[in-house]
């Protein structure tokens, strides 16, 4: 495990050595997921032999409080499937009440949306990303291992009914599986305020063969969009890495997340904390910096902030995916993608 010294670093902002400032925290609250997606957990969630508890509500409050004190404005709750936690609403309420936090976002597989999305909104979830890898129910089942396509679609409609003005939908782009649905997805968002985001398949330790078989560059879609009159939109400082395209004839938008693109890391603005309390500087990076020993008491906040800053000074300028190095990540379920 990486050892980070505790010292008075003389700063209260999350700024790395390349002058990138980190406004955005992706916080995994569980590794557990009830879907069996082919590109992530094809055999379903397998509990580790040495069971370690996920972050408690108090630990979550302390870690997000430290990030907020150092300039973080947006927190995204990920997993696993974050809504599987029994205290999910309490987590949202706690984070949204912290000083400095302006947005609490959620990434979900959507299986509970129809029933629970109104409660999520009241608790403080300001935006939702839903994973939908196919608009064909049979293909959806083939990719996710769950026959819940119609349930997820109803959940998205319910979110609009109760007041969400925009929903983001994530689809992992896979050659010969769902890339042929691009026009179908595009037509789906023509009259709906949906930002349809296509994410390039990413290489991880357990999925090398899958990656080699199904990876498709998002640049192909970017060129297609530009030819059809779509316009690249400017980013806000808390936005994620997606390149977002809009079109005057479409209510919805198209986003492309292309981690293999040159300069992908230049505008990095997010850090990640795993469900077991490790800080990860990069999705494709190191083993992680353990924070849990500094989440025991509220009196540890200053030391916790010092460790966060010290760790951040070791963040690389960019990942090494182009060299075939995806770090130690065996899959994306434990860190929320």
From Swiss-Prot:
Name any cofactors this protein relies on: [4Fe-4S] cluster
User: Which residues take part in binding GTP?
Assistant: 26, 76, 107, 168, 270-272
Pathway(s) = Cofactor biosynthesis; molybdopterin biosynthesis
Describe how the cofactor binds.
Binds 2 [4Fe-4S] clusters. Binds 1 [4Fe-4S] cluster coordinated with 3 cysteines and an exchangeable S-adenosyl-L-methionine and 1 [4Fe-4S] cluster coordinated with 3 cysteines and the GTP-derived substrate.
Give the residues the record marks as binding [4Fe-4S] cluster 1: 33, 37, 40
Q: Which Pfam families match?
A: Fer4_12, Mob_synth_C, Radical_SAM
A GO BP term, please?
A: Mo-molybdopterin cofactor biosynthetic process
Top-level taxon of the source organism: Bacteria
Q: What reaction(s) does this enzyme catalyze? A: GTP + AH2 + S-adenosyl-L-methionine = (8S)-3',8-cyclo-7,8-dihydroguanosine 5'-triphosphate + 5'-deoxyadenosine + L-methionine + A + H(+)
Q: Which GO terms describe its molecular function?
A: 4 iron, 4 sulfur cluster binding; cyclic pyranopterin monophosphate synthase activity; GTP 3',8'-cyclase activity; GTP binding; metal ion binding; S-adenosyl-L-methionine binding
Q: Keyword annotations for this protein?
A: 4Fe-4S, GTP-binding, Iron, Iron-sulfur, Lyase, Metal-binding, Molybdenum cofactor biosynthesis, Nucleotide-binding, S-adenosyl-L-methionine
Disulfide pairings: none
The UniProt record gives the binding positions of S-adenosyl-L-methionine as 39, 80, 131, 202
Q: What does this protein do?
A: Catalyzes the cyclization of GTP to (8S)-3',8-cyclo-7,8-dihydroguanosine 5'-triphosphate.
User: Into which family does the record put it?
Assistant: Belongs to the radical SAM superfamily. MoaA family.
Q: What is this protein called?
A: GTP 3',8-cyclase
Origin organism is Mannheimia succiniciproducens (strain KCTC 0769BP / MBEL55E)
Q: Which gene encodes it?
A: moaA
